[in-house]
């Protein structure tokens, strides 16, 4: 009767390494196949739905192609992205040159309204999804710099539109673009176009030398004031108290913004939505962390008050 000789430690290590390599390769292959399939669905959907006239319309997609919500595990991405890097982003030279019908494919260019609400750094789209039904007559845009996260939100919106296509509300007023709001915001929006801007759980950039990359600075606030109409509101929320104090300090010091009261925040429906909708906010709640909110109203330009 023969017996199998025990493997030495080197052979065991080689087998373990080979198994791990095969597992990682399988995961990467699955992720690649999934992304390719989602991209094909995304391109088909946009091409079919963006046709401006019934004569040019293409056949509808089979429901099983788009009705499934995307899975986050196939959209792996770093938590943050350097806003000063060259990301090869596409952006219009002027807002008038932007083709919004590609972002809101159920609207023809003739019927398309202007975007009124912007979620800057929209992440996985939780706030967008909850804001949409509250403002069905307003176009709401998410801006996200990370490519795979943007793709996830696009695929999520495509699936939601298909799932709810027979409902009174079907998420047609929501859109997302990959863009860098710190560089190109005025390329997308005209003066006084927006009524609300949301900054939810932005990158805190803890190191002092990185503070210049924070989404709220004196220079950027002037750009936000340019695209925000008088009486419009800037919403901020974070779980980092130091960042909250930073944002409050800079907004307090800017002449075109005035902080709204705690009573106003308690009554505003957008604050309630912002507090609980984002994936980051839900993670903070699970970890029993604190959330810091500050909302500011856009004041009239000084020249207009004279």
UniProtKB/Swiss-Prot annotation:
The keyword Chaperone does not apply. It catalyses: guanosine(46) in tRNA + S-adenosyl-L-methionine = N(7)-methylguanosine(46) in tRNA + S-adenosyl-L-homocysteine. Pathway: tRNA modification; N(7)-methylguanine-tRNA biosynthesis. Residues 1-65 are annotated as: Disordered. Keywords: Methyltransferase, Nucleus, RNA-binding, S-adenosyl-L-methionine, Transferase, tRNA processing, tRNA-binding. Residues 1-19 have a biased composition (Polar residues). The keyword Hydrolase does not apply. One of its GO terms (molecular function) is tRNA (guanine(46)-N7)-methyltransferase activity. SUPFAM superfamilies: S-adenosyl-L-methionine-dependent methyltransferases. InterPro entries: SAM-dependent_MTases_sf, Trm8_euk, tRNA_(Gua-N-7)_MeTrfase_Trmb. Pfam families: Methyltransf_4 (PF02390). It is found in: Nucleus. One of its GO terms (cellular component) is nucleus. Disulfide bonds: none annotated. Its EC number is 2.1.1.33. The active site is at 203. S-adenosyl-L-methionine binds at residues 121, 144-145, 180-181, 200, 278-280. Forms a complex with TRM82. Catalyzes the formation of N(7)-methylguanine at position 46 (m7G46) in tRNA. Belongs to the class I-like SAM-binding methyltransferase superfamily. TrmB family. This is tRNA (guanine-N(7)-)-methyltransferase. It comes from Lodderomyces elongisporus (strain ATCC 11503 / CBS 2605 / JCM 1781 / NBRC 1676 / NRRL YB-4239). The gene is TRM8.
């Amino acid at each position: 009767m023969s017996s199998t000789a025990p493997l030495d430690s080197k052979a065991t290590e080689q087998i373990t390494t080979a198994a791990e390599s095969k597992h990682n390769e399988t995961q990467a292959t699955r992720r690649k196949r999934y992304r390719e399939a989602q991209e094909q669905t995304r391109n088909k959907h946009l091409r079919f739905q963006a046709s401006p006239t019934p004569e040019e319309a293409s056949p509808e997609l089979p429901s099983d192609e788009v009705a499934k919500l995307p899975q986050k595990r196939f959209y792996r991405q770093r938590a943050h992205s350097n806003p000063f890097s060259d990301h090869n982003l596409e952006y219009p030279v002027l807002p008038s040159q932007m083709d919004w019908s590609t972002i809101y494919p159920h609207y023809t260019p003739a019927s398309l309204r202007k975007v009124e609400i912007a979620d800057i750094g929209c992440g996985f789209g939780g706030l967008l999804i909850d804001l949409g039904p509250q403002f069905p007559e307003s176009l709401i845009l998410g801006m996200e710099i990370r490519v795979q996260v943007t793709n996830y939100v696009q695929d999520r919106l495509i699936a939601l539109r298909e799932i709810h296509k027979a409902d009174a509300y079907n998420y047609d007023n929501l859109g997302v673009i990959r863009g860098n709001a710190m560089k190109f915001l005025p390329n997308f929006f005209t003066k006084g176009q927006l009524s609300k801007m949301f900054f939810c759980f932005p990158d805190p950039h803890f190191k002092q030398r990185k503070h210049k990359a924070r989404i709220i600075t004196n220079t950027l606030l002037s750009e936000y004031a340019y695209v925000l109409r008088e009486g419009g509101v800037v919403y901020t929320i974070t779980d980092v108290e130091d960042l909250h104090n930073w944002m409050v300090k800079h907004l307090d010091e800017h002449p075109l913004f005035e902080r709204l009261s705690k009573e106003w925040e308690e009554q505003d429906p957008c604050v309630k939505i912002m507090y609980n909708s984002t994936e980051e906010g839900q993670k903070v709640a699970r970890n029993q962390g604190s959330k810091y909110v500050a909302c500011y109203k856009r004041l009239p330009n000084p020249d207009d008050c004279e």
